[in-house]
Amino acid sequence: MDYATRAAGGLVPVVIEQSARGERAFDIYSRLLKERVIFLVGQVEDYMANLVIAQLLFLESENPDKDIHLYINSPGGLVTAGLAIYDTMQFIKPDVSTLCVGQAASMGALLLAGGAAGKRYCLPHSRIMIHQPLGGFQGQASDIDIHAREILAVRDRLNKILAHHTGQPIEKIQIDTDRDNFMGGNDAVEYGLIDKVLVSRASGAA
């Protein structure tokens, strides 16, 4: 069972396609993958990241010149898993268009902002949230110090990524991510996290 199936509670519709060779059944996510649509749903974690990365690489091999559409509805999750997806988005040749449906928080927001310039969207009632990475560690004082320094280094890295994709000064990013910072679509456009709020597909959708 893949992560999208698990996120849907194990209930995933099956669609039937008719062709000259007869009928063929697809789960809905596999059918949408044929249209170069990838769903990033739920917590960002290693298993989900591996599947998203595999789909990105597969679609690149299918057609390196055609856009990939990444639909995001995520509260965030592991920084390392999120950065693995982010790095792959930047690495592959096709543009990755991002679209927030529902929410894109924490690493979800960074992945939304990391889409191809001019191709980052959200739907009208989506919520987007940026903040600094969370961390907690117990152990010897020296180990706690090591982990504290790592969290600060990760925070700086994430802030630089957001500054790069939003065009905001790094100093403003540092202030704005100090606490949970929620935005609606229009605020996210003004901030530079996305390029447009889509009301309908006719308005220029992914």
Swiss-Prot record:
Pfam families: CLP_protease
CDD domains: S14_ClpP_2
Keywords assigned by UniProt, alphabetized: Cytoplasm, Hydrolase, Protease, Serine protease
EC class: hydrolase
Annotated Gene3D superfamilies: 2-enoyl-CoA Hydratase, Chain A, domain 1
Predominant location category: cytoplasm
EC number annotated for this UniProt entry: 3.4.21.92
The reaction(s) this protein catalyses: Hydrolysis of proteins to small peptides in the presence of ATP and magnesium. alpha-casein is the usual test substrate. In the absence of ATP, only oligopeptides shorter than five residues are hydrolyzed (such as succinyl-Leu-Tyr-|-NHMec, and Leu-Tyr-Leu-|-Tyr-Trp, in which cleavage of the -Tyr-|-Leu- and -Tyr-|-Trp bonds also occurs)
Subcellular location: Cytoplasm
Active site: 106 (nucleophile), 131
Entry annotated with the keyword Kinase: no
Domain of life: Bacteria
One of the GO biological process terms: protein quality control for misfolded or incompletely synthesized proteins
One Gene Ontology MF term: serine-type endopeptidase activity
GO cellular component: cytoplasm; endopeptidase Clp complex
InterPro entries cross-referenced by the UniProt entry: ClpP, ClpP/crotonase-like_dom_sf, ClpP/TepA, ClpP_His_AS, ClpP_Ser_AS
PANTHER family the UniProt entry points to: ATP-DEPENDENT CLP PROTEASE PROTEOLYTIC SUBUNIT
Free-text function comment from the UniProt entry: Cleaves peptides in various proteins in a process that requires ATP hydrolysis. Has a chymotrypsin-like activity. Plays a major role in the degradation of misfolded proteins.
UniProt family annotation: Belongs to the peptidase S14 family.
Subunit: Fourteen ClpP subunits assemble into 2 heptameric rings which stack back to back to give a disk-like structure with a central cavity, resembling the structure of eukaryotic proteasomes.
Protein name: ATP-dependent Clp protease proteolytic subunit 1
Natural source organism: Methylococcus capsulatus (strain ATCC 33009 / NCIMB 11132 / Bath)
